[in-house]
């Protein structure tokens, strides 16, 4: 895993490239290694990002979603859910910053599954009925772990594929990567704006 240190508008930042997933067979310690390294480096504000499937029918490829709640489908329950993760001023401030800077940012509920398979049609319908707006295979354990260690943390999803029961084809990993690249400008502008105003 690569760690990149730099600045954004004279503010020091650390970027972690890549992460470890539970579905790859990694332990808790390995999955939390980026957060632990951030703690070691003295980071107090953490932005955790991911690529996610869009469950909400209004979502489009390359949309960005601020995570304001979650559904934990990982069956691990490492930590007790902490609703305080999603009820602090920084979330409201980020939404305002995005609006003021004309950066399109949705808000929604992220469902975390163990993976690594993409969802079946029945699962898509179930997720929608449960109130999920997006689904992925990471992030929530890291958010809860960071919060447990008193770090201000927010999660942002990039919608890289749309989950529709009418889809005839399967989701290809290359399509997910391509969608992530198409969101680059909007995503980087959002991160830059958040850091500059933090």
Task: Locate each region found by the language model.
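Histidine/lysine/aspartate-rich catalytic loop segments that bind and position anionic ligands
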Residues: 70-116
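General beta-strand structural signal in soluble alpha/beta enzymes
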Residues: 15-17, 46-50, 66, 105-111, ...
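His/Asp/Glu-rich mid-to-C-terminal helical/loop segments that flank catalytic regions of hydrolases
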Residues: 164-198
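Non-catalytic positions within long, well-ordered alpha-helices that form the structural scaffold/packing
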Residues: 39-42, 128, 147
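Active-site/ligand-binding-proximal alpha/beta "capping" segment
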Residues: 96-133, 188-191, 198
């Amino acid at each position: 895993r690569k760690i990149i240190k730099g600045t954004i508008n004279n503010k020091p930042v650390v970027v972690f490239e890549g992460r470890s997933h539970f579905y790859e067979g990694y332990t808790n310690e390995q999955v939390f290694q980026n957060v632990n390294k951030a703690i070691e480096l003295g980071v107090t504000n953490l932005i955790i990002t991911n690529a996610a499937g869009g469950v909400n029918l209004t979502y489009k490829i390359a949309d960005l979603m601020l995570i304001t709640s979650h559904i934990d489908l990982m069956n691990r329950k490492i930590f007790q859910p902490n609703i305080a993760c999603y009820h602090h001023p920084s979330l409201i401030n980020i939404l305002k910053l995005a609006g003021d800077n004309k950066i399109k940012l949705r808000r929604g509920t992220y469902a975390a599954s163990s993976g690594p398979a993409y969802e079946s049609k029945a699962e898509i319908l179930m997720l929608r009925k449960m109130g999920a707006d997006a689904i992925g295979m990471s992030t929530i354990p890291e958010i809860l772990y960071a919060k447990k260690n008193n770090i201000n943390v927010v999660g942002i999803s990039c919608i890289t594929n749309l989950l529709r029961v009418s889809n005839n084809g399967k989701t290809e990993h290359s399509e997910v990567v391509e969608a992530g690249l198409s969101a680059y400008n909007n995503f980087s502008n959002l991160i830059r704006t958040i850091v500059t105003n933090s």
